[in-house]
Amino acid sequence: MTVVDGDVREAAATLDAVAAGVDLSAPVCLLMGYLLHFFAPDAARDLVARYVAALAPGSYLVLSVGRGDSDAADKGFGSYSAGAARVYNHSVPEFASFFGPLELVPPGVVDAREWRPGWEQPLHLPPRDGQVIVGVARTG
């Protein structure tokens, strides 16, 4: 695992720093968790595409964003956006478009709680007004 300090929007510089510790000519897994809700849809698609272009065939891309379909979720997104950073409540189809032409791994784009069917949610985790949507895709 390699951690670099940089601006994710500067893909070329970030990838150069990563390449100092990771062989990007071999398959890797790129995690972009809780990141893309800070980007407008077109900017998110562009950002993901720039990173995916650097991945070797057989690599995996994992994306997740927070979102919600309730008044409470809308209030939360609004409150956050009124502060230091604008956040976007991406729809599921919009989020799915961030994967571009990549092949999604089953079960596809789903609520994170549905990623492992049959898994019992611990009793101490209450239902939420919002959700986390996730997806995993494999590069060709």
Give the location of each predicted region.
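Alpha-helical subdomain
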Residues: 1-140
